[in-house]
């Protein structure tokens, strides 16, 4: 029996994610937190969580450090997600999100992360060379802590190509700019990230579509542009599609993009068509927005929303 395709998620800046629900949150006041959630976080770890929920073999890697790093690794073990990380001299960061259901706001305070030393960067590159042989897909998600070279993701993309692995890039800033030049298999930018690549904000949906096409012209096979509540655009050799998410009772947007990416990878592995892959992704992003905690949506919640995703082909 042929083994099921497996995914390696890379999180350079893993975190202890704390999400608090505070009604009527505002500045210069003291609040007592009545409900909250503390979990292992970071964009790649969120991706791994949803892939695991959907039954896809997955492993998480990246940097961890200190007591926070130990908490992250232990939390992953408790969730049944294997991890193989490089340990750093510094302490993994803490990210705090305050959700106010009264005002419909979400305030985030994210630590910058520990200083990564050159030998630690080399250690992760060496680990990735060994791990890549065991996987079919690699995701490069999120930010990098201080000390990580701007071209780190670009190096891994080239490494993956040499190993015959499909690399998905979902990052920002210089990591994204260098990364797209290395030609990943898939890239998933939002509006702000497109602006970082092209030096200007896309002008509406048409502007985002044009930028996605330009990324495709570089040789990237699949480009998915996320537009938040306005939906998402898919551009690939199969064609171009736009999808609109269904209405849900909003709780938190933290992890919705990661849930979307994980569900799209799942759908690709299942051999689904491009529009169905996009539907799965958009449904997962919406399902995540309706739960407390990044990446804790269930298969049932995703499947319930798939028929409610409006998807149309873009005819040139």
Predicted regions and their residues:
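Glycine-rich phosphate/adenosyl-contacting loop at the front of the ribokinase-like
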Residues: 1-61, 69-71, 315-316
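Hydrophobic anchor at the start of a short beta-strand
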Residues: 7, 57-58, 83, 167, ...
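Short beta-strand-to-turn element immediately C-terminal to the catalytic PLP-Schiff-base lysine
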Residues: 22, 99, 233-237
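Glycine/charged-rich beta-loop-alpha catalytic/anionic-binding loops adjacent to active sites
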Residues: 26-35, 108, 239-249
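Conserved N-terminal subdomain of the carbohydrate kinase-like
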Residues: 29, 53-135, 304-316
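Surface-exposed amphipathic alpha-helices with a cationic face
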Residues: 52, 154-161, 213-216
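Conserved beta-alpha-beta core of the PfkB/ribokinase-like small-molecule kinase fold
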Residues: 123, 137-207
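Conserved phosphate-binding/catalytic region of the ribokinase-like
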Residues: 162, 177, 205-316
